[in-house]
């Protein structure tokens, strides 16, 4: 039923007969179609009608029947040409088939001269035939209308060769459809689909009276009412339509259909008996503007501009060009509105809230209504006067005051003419939101930041030489103009002789420049007034105040004394600070600043030293250290006391006038035995209080890169053995360094370290890299590398324990009591393992044999004690290197 209703609705709109069917008829048709035999007969009937041979027989019978009535019938079979697509009344889609037939007469032309211009040309006469409109469906299965317009094939051929003649054919077809069927076609949105013919071709019938009809044929037929009405006598003559004299240009844009609805809210306050209950009843809450856009599927190509009093719509899409400019009956809030496009009905709905009067205006209106509705009782109330004379005096004073106020208002209106004298009443003017003012000599220039200003719309007026009023229009993005007004007025405090001579406005694409030429220099002008009109002016300063940082403006500088000028650039605030003080004061201030900076640096260093905590590597080193047992510590303490006594005896034997240089040169004891500030080294035992060593800055080496030479970075060995001359082989990489070639000064107790104790660091250019295989996981490689490092570490410890155990046993049982006995005991305690026990037994059985060859050159003329000291120092150096390797492996793990 919905499809039938839709078809009937459109048929009724466009003049066709409405199909009226009852429920009984519809039920019978439904039952009949359920019968298989009826459906078979119905399909046979359809095939018979569509058969071309049967159509010819049908046309012959119709021709014979009409001839018996004295009517000649001619069937026109249209041949496809091309199709024009448009819309009817902007709502229903429409197709016009431009066809050809030999029955239609050929187009002819005549030579004619234009009476107005005198030009010579051709006047064409183009015959055509039209068929009644029929319903069809488009590609989206929606209802549409189809019209057939038939021309001679020669006319179609000329249209294919000449574009102007083709346009003439299209205009002729559109005019014929609009005239015959009383419809409005959308000529601004014509489309030409790739079709030769829309729908199934239908034959068109031309009916006219027979010229040689007999008397019998002219007699009325008994069944005349069942046949079509006979044509009139002049029906056979073709209609000749004169050419349009005033040819209307084809519109570029179509005007869509629209409607404005007033939306109200139900407010219960309007149903009370208050006087102001219905003051806003006639003003709607919002305006709803509905615009029909049947040729648009979305509003992506639409431009919509909404102002307080108008709505402007523009669509430049090919085949769907719309333009609408609509004035609104009420002032609306364009910032709070919303728009929604209904894709099903192709309708744009715009909701705009109406701006109502403010609370102040409503209150004033309420008071006025209350005053007007007050009834006069004839009795005067609240009279404070005691006699009629006082009333007369009060009345006279009131009259004088009122007259004065009226005179003042009249003067003001005379000084400033009303706004309507220059600005138009029907336009809404806006104030320029952003502008700048510059003053140079007698020129006052205003830069108004308004783009796309039309130069033709600029108008200026000078009022009494004290103010200038400017109005102009700017074209927005939707080609909708916006009007602006700008009034500049000189303040009352300005010089009375200063006035405006003339004005030069200049408009560009980005802004407007307004130059005011004064009668004299206006550099001293403090301010000016600006606004849209004389009733709404705001005061602006010509020169903004400068920012100064002068704290004391009353300070006097003595010019006789030399001055110190300093500047400070502040990039953050974009400012410059200039300080001017006398020279003597500046020196004192400079010294005080230096002292304060030094104190701050010392405090900062102390805080860092106090809050400094050991990192993760230091904690790992501390975990690796092992403490000695109590028994070993007691033995070391006893040996240390014996050593201290021997040192005191040796110092007493030395001559009193001996210098530190002679001690260093003649003494067989190493320099490290002298008293220096005690500093601890991880590679030696912490029980040795007399050791004075310093740890190298770049001691910890990487396991995966080449170890740097001792010449590049100082290590712990040169700190402890600076007076020895030795050669060390570490981790299979041979490198040597002379520890005795660098003379170092050693100061006895309570002396500071000399410059020779400072470390010099040199960095190598070698870059350490870590490679990973692509076909294995990182965790798997890490476990393998860790196992490999553990095996290497155990092998190195095993070799050292087997090769150096003899040296440790000799040092442990030595009775000379030298300085490094405690270190040897600590190392022996640290490396106590089953293999070491076997080495000790082996070393006891071979005491008289030569010691293990460690690669050190020990041949000298010193006594036996010095040789033993040298051996112990070599063993300590090797142990230190082993500890360093151990630490490096732990870090890698």
From Swiss-Prot:
Residues 656-667, 684-694 have a biased composition (Polar residues). Its main location: cytoplasm. GO terms for molecular function: protein phosphatase 1 binding. It is found in: Cytoplasm. Residues 214-232, 865-877 have a biased composition (Basic and acidic residues). The modification Phosphoserine is found at residues 377, 801. Residues 609-626, 781-797 have a biased composition (Basic residues). GO terms for cellular component: cytoplasm. PANTHER family: PIH1 DOMAIN-CONTAINING PROTEIN 1 (PTHR22997), PROTEIN KINTOUN (PTHR22997:SF3). HAMAP family: Kintoun. Interacts with Pp1alpha-96A, Pp1-87B, Pp1-13C and flw. Belongs to the PIH1 family. Kintoun subfamily. This is Protein kintoun. It comes from Drosophila grimshawi (Hawaiian fruit fly). The lineage of its organism: Eukaryota, Metazoa, Ecdysozoa, Arthropoda, Hexapoda. The gene is Nop17l.
